[in-house]
Amino acid sequence: MKLLTVAFSLLLLGQVHASPLVLDKRSSCQLGDVWDLNAADAACSASCAIQHGDKHGGHCDKNKVCVCN
């Protein structure tokens, strides 16, 4: 029973830890596209530079998900 509880806890922790990354990839493109400023790609590029010091560019794909180059 304890093994099942530990396994379930690790699975749940893994899902919680993985979720913010997807949300963050979408949020930079969506927030950059507010008020028709067309700054989504710039926000994505800045997000890539902050998160990955070695990646200095990025763009938003057709699903508004940030793709770091």
From Swiss-Prot:
UniProt family annotation: Belongs to the invertebrate defensin family.
PANTHER family for the chain: DEFENSIN (PTHR13645:SF0)
GO terms for MF: lipid binding
Function: Shows antibacterial activity against numerous Gram-positive bacteria. It selectively inhibits peptidoglycan biosynthesis through complex formation with the cell wall precursor lipid II (1:1 molar ratio) thus inhibiting cell wall synthesis.
Gene Ontology terms: biological process: defense response to bacterium; humoral immune response
Organism from which the protein derives: Aspergillus oryzae (strain ATCC 42149 / RIB 40)
Residue stretch(es) of the prosequence: 19-26
Gene Ontology cellular-component terms listed: extracellular region; membrane; other organism cell membrane
Coiled coil: none
Cysteine pairs bridged by disulfides in the record: C29-C60, C44-C66, C48-C68
Signal peptide start and end residues: 1-18
Protein name as annotated: Fungal defensin oryzeasin
Alphabetized Gene3D superfamilies for the sequence: Knottin, scorpion toxin-like (3.30.30.10)
Keyword set, alphabetical order: Antibiotic, Antimicrobial, Cleavage on pair of basic residues, Defensin, Disulfide bond, Immunity, Innate immunity, Lipid-binding, Membrane, Secreted, Signal, Target cell membrane, Target membrane
Subcellular location: Secreted; Target cell membrane
